[in-house]
C-alpha cells in the first residue's frame, strides 16, 4: 500500500514590510491597539507580485531543494482565496510557469483551512497509488482584497506563500484527520460579485472587500475548533508541536488552555506576517524547519490545524 510523506518545505513573502506604526499613519489605529488585540506587529505587502508569482517562487524552491525536474510532478494543488483571476487557476499558472507538463493542477478554496484541506486531498491522491509526487502550496495576496480604510480588517492580514513537496513513502506519515464545514455560517467573506446580465435588475451592489466578523471567528475557534482538536489528540495522542492557523495570538493562548496542552508546543509567527489565510500554516512549517525547531526525517509529530471562513476547520496529525 502506498503512503505519503512531506519531503521538502519552502516559503516566500514579499520584501515590503508594513509595521503597525506604518498603518497608524493611514488609518485610526496604533501599534498598541493592534498588538494588544492580535499579537501582530508587522506584515508583508506585495507591491506588484500576484498570488501566482508567490506560489511559483515556492514551487521553484521545492524543486531546487529536492533535485526533481518539473516533469516528474504528478499534480500541483494551490489553496487560496485571492487568485490572480477566476480562471485560469493559480495552480494552473504555477504548473505552466514551472513546466510541470505531466501534472494536473487545481485550486482549493477553503479560506484559512485551505492548506489543510489541500494537503489532506494530496495525501489521498498519493495513497491511491495512482500518483507519486506533487506540490501543495498555500498562497495569498490578501492586500488586494482589503478596504484600507477599515481598521477592523486591514490591520490583520498580510501576503505570503508556503508549500510542501509530497512524495510516496513506504511508511505511514499521516495519522489523524478531521475535516469540517458549516456552510450555514460565514464569519469571513471576500470578493462578492454582482449578478449582471441583460436580464438582471441591476440593483445588487455587493461589497467587493474582505469582511470579517472577528468576534464570531474568535468564539468559533476557541469553542468549536479547540473541541475538534482535543478530540483528535485524545484519539491519536499528543503531537510534539501544534501548527495552527496564524490568526491571533489570543486564539492560540486560549486554545492551548482549552486543549490542556503546554503553550510552548504552539508555534507562532503572526507577529511578523499577520494573518496570511491559506499560506499561514505552510509558512510557519517552513520557517520552523529552517530554524531547526522541526526536522524533516526526525519522526517528530505535528498537528496542523486551519480554521476560518465557510465556516471551515480541519486538522491533520503528521509525522515529519
UniProtKB/Swiss-Prot annotation:
GO molecular function: 3-oxoacyl-[acyl-carrier-protein] synthase activity; beta-ketoacyl-acyl-carrier-protein synthase III activity
Catalytic activity: malonyl-[ACP] + acetyl-CoA + H(+) = 3-oxobutanoyl-[ACP] + CO2 + CoA
Keyword annotations from UniProtKB, A to Z: Acyltransferase, Cytoplasm, Fatty acid biosynthesis, Fatty acid metabolism, Lipid biosynthesis, Lipid metabolism, Multifunctional enzyme, Transferase
Pathway listed: Lipid metabolism; fatty acid biosynthesis
GO biological process, one term: fatty acid biosynthetic process
First-tier enzyme category under EC: transferase
Active-site residue list: 112, 245, 275
Keyword Lipid biosynthesis belongs to the record: yes
Domain of life where this protein originates: Bacteria
Region (ACP-binding): 246-250
Keyword Amino-acid biosynthesis listed: no
Similarity comment: Belongs to the thiolase-like superfamily. FabH family.
Subunit structure: Homodimer.
Function noted in UniProt: Catalyzes the condensation reaction of fatty acid synthesis by the addition to an acyl acceptor of two carbons from malonyl-ACP. Catalyzes the first condensation reaction which initiates fatty acid synthesis and may therefore play a role in governing the total rate of fatty acid production. Possesses both acetoacetyl-ACP synthase and acetyl transacylase activities. Its substrate specificity determines the biosynthesis of branched-chain and/or straight-chain of fatty acids.
Name used for this protein in its record: Beta-ketoacyl-[acyl-carrier-protein] synthase III
Species per Swiss-Prot/TrEMBL record: Streptococcus thermophilus (strain ATCC BAA-250 / LMG 18311)
Amino acid at each position: 500500500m502506498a503512503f505519503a510523506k512531506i519531503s521538502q518545505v519552502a516559503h516566500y513573502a514579499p520584501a515590503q514590510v508594513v509595521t503597525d506604526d506604518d498603518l497608524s499613519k493611514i488609518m485610526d489605529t496604533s501599534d498598541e491597539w493592534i498588538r494588544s488585540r492580535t499579537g501582530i506587529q508587522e506584515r508583508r505587502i506585495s507591491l506588484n507580485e500576484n498570488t501566482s508569482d508567490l506560489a511559483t517562487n515556492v514551487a521553484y524552491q521545492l524543486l531546487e531543494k529536492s533535485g526533481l525536474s518539473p516533469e516528474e510532478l504528478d499534480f500541483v494543488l494551490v489553496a487560496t482565496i485571492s487568485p490572480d483571476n477566476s480562471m485560469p487557476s493559480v495552480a494552473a499558472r504555477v504548473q505552466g510557469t514551472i513546466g510541470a507538463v505531466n501534472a494536473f493542477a487545481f485550486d482549493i478554496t477553503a479560506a484559512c483551512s485551505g492548506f489543510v484541506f489541500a494537503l489532506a486531498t494530496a495525501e489521498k491522491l498519493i495513497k491511491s497509488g495512482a500518483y507519486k509526487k506533487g506540490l501543495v502550496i498555500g498562497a495569498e495576496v490578501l492586500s488586494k482584497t482589503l478596504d484600507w480604510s477599515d481598521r477592523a480588517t486591514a490591520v490583520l492580514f498580510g501576503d505570503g506563500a508556503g508549500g510542501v513537496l509530497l512524495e510516496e513513502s513506504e511508511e505511514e506519515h499521516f495519522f489523524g484527520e478531521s475535516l469540517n464545514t458549516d456552510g450555514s455560517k460565514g464569519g469571513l467573506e471576500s470578493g462578492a460579485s454582482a449578478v449582471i446580465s441583460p436580464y438582471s435588475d441591476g440593483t445588487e451592489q455587493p461589497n467587493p472587500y474582505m469582511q470579517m466578523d472577528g468576534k464570531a471567528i474568535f468564539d468559533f475557534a476557541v469553542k468549536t475548533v479547540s473541541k475538534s482538536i482535543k478530540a483528535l489528540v485524545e484519539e491519536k495522542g499528543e503531537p510534539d508541536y501544534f501548527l495552527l492557523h496564524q490568526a491571533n495570538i489570543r486564539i492560540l493562548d486560549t486554545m492551548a488552555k482549552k486543549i490542556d496542552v503546554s503553550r510552548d508546543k504552539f508555534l507562532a509567527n503572526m507577529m511578523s506576517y499577520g494573518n496570511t489565510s491559506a499560506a499561514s500554516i505552510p509558512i510557519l512549517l517552513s520557517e520552523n524547519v529552517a530554524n531547526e525547531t522541526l526536522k524533516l526525517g526526525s519522526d517528530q509529530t505535528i498537528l496542523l490545524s486551519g480554521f476560518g471562513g465557510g465556516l471551515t476547520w480541519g486538522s491533520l496529525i503528521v509525522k515529519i
